């Protein structure tokens, strides 16, 4: 297990960050975890026309997201915005 494993969020945590686009996927710069970024899982699965609408709505905004998956060995964090919206 790597040293930074203890500084990553757990699945089910709600975290806050700013959305940006990179390589046709939406990522989130995490405010509480400054050395890590998370990927919005639903942005990868979308068709391009729906993705463009989704991107225009979220890029540059500060949002709360729910952590759905964490790979502690690689430092990958997958988050979901839709699940967070349903709970609010």
From Swiss-Prot:
InterPro entries: K3-like_poxvir (IPR016397), NA-bd_OB-fold (IPR012340), S1_domain (IPR003029). Interacts with host EIF2AK2/PKR kinase. Residues 8-82 form the S1 motif domain. Keywords: Host-virus interaction, Inhibition of host innate immune response by virus, Inhibition of host interferon signaling pathway by virus, Inhibition of host PKR by virus, Interferon antiviral system evasion, RNA-binding, Viral immunoevasion. Belongs to the poxviridae K3 protein family. It comes from the Viruses. One of its GO terms (cellular component) is cytoplasm. The C-terminus is involved in the inhibition of host EIF2AK2/PKR kinase. GO terms for molecular function: peptidase inhibitor activity; protein sequestering activity; protein serine/threonine kinase inhibitor activity; RNA binding. This is Protein K3. GO terms for biological process: symbiont-mediated suppression of host innate immune response; symbiont-mediated suppression of host PKR/eIFalpha signaling; symbiont-mediated suppression of host type I interferon-mediated signaling pathway. SMART domains: S1. Pfam families: S1 (PF00575). Changing residue 74 to A: Complete loss of inhibition of host EIF2AK2/PKR kinase. It comes from Vaccinia virus (strain Western Reserve). Residues 43-53, 74-79 are annotated as: Binding to host EIF2AK2/PKR. The record marks 45 as: Involved in host species specificity.
């Amino acid at each position: 297990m790597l040293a930074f494993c203890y500084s990553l969020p757990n699945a089910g945590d709600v975290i806050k960050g700013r959305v940006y686009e990179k390589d046709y996927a939406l990522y989130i710069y995490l405010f509480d975890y400054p050395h890590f970024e998370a990927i919005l899982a639903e942005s990868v699965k979308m068709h391009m026309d729906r993705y463009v609408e989704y991107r225009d709505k979220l890029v540059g905004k500060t949002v709360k997201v729910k952590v759905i998956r964490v790979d502690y060995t690689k430092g990958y964090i997958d988050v979901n915005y839709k699940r967070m919206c349903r709970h609010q």
